[in-house]
């Protein structure tokens, strides 16, 4: 991606390597100029998949054959699968890739590729195994409350060190990142490295330390990275940082981290090593679990349904029927597994399989433990961080589709779970509930759950009960006026 290309091209180590980066904002004419002035040198073009067409156009303009004269290397080729669901153009160069005389794909965390052209062209898999012990220790912090677990993890790290080390946090959600920084009062001491749109989004919240390109001088005590920086970027620090990965499946499923690819890549960013690795995660038993065979069976069935509907579309007798069948075709699941020409997109299919298998890891803590235990790159240790109220309760409280009455029922249920609120953590939870609905929290503190339920959550009746309770305990002289105001609306 762009940060990697810019980083490589600007690296002093490569100043004599004749590198040329191609991405958004670099045009065909720029590539032509580079090719013309590099006639007696090796061409070394680094391009995003989305900009590959500009490289092709430049070669064609100069009547040169890139297929014959160049070696095409797909670096970090696991991204062809991992990003296929949201970067539709990442596979654009793949048809050209198979036309090159000399070509290869490389990755430290490869994923099985099922495109039949690999077999047709007799591709070989070459695996390089280190001769040294490369396993790293990782702590899995299982929790029902990612915010509080993150806070406690930071507190532990800060208390253990005389000279604080950088803390690098990988979360694929700028919404979660901003929430963590704000709630834990880290805004002044944090930097965020993310996509340009996310930089703008954070800017609208008055946060100015957000960047689309990484550089060491932009780092702070706490450094947050989204998926744009999970792979290939070289982070060379004099100190060995603490690495924290965070997954919140309740807030955003796309924060799931794959132990076999994502986790390895994140740790691999730090060329001089790390001090510790922690993965904080909740789990969600509602996530469907499927075997690889079941997932493939679903794809086969989806394909047959698509073919049947496509046949109806092709045989439709009139325009109205064709429009109806076209709409049906576009809504079918298999439609997402086709390229722009209507052919099977094998990388989209591989992506679906990979994503569905990854969901299995987050069904329960045992599944995630097993995934890390089976990964050759880590030695995992587990620790539980469980609290009175967690992410599931937050999700239920923040559900915008529920009625006010249902929301208040949920808040009362959570107040019951909290009890007397003796710890600072419990007081924080209660402040969150007050922010969500101060009336029902005050009502609970004044008249209690039983009275609220007897009055069937009627705001008018609960308010009367609160006034009467306060009068019986300590009269202020204003109770009658308050009761009248509660019973009548001005102007009616």
Protein language model features and the residues they cover:
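Conserved helicase ATPase core of P-loop NTP-dependent helicases/translocases
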Residues: 198-226
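Interdomain hinge/linker at the junction between the two RecA-like core domains of SF2 helicases
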Residues: 108-156
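SF2 helicase catalytic motif II
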Residues: 48-52, 60-104
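The feature captures the C-terminal accessory region of ATP-dependent helicases
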Residues: 297-492
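Conserved Walker A/P-loop ATP-binding site and its immediately adjacent core
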Residues: 1-27, 49-53, 111-114, 173-175
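SF2 helicase motor core recognition
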Residues: 34, 51-64, 107, 216, ...
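Conserved strand-helix element at the start of the C-terminal RecA-like helicase core
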Residues: 1-9, 45-49, 153-185
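Conserved SF2 helicase motif VI
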Residues: 250-277
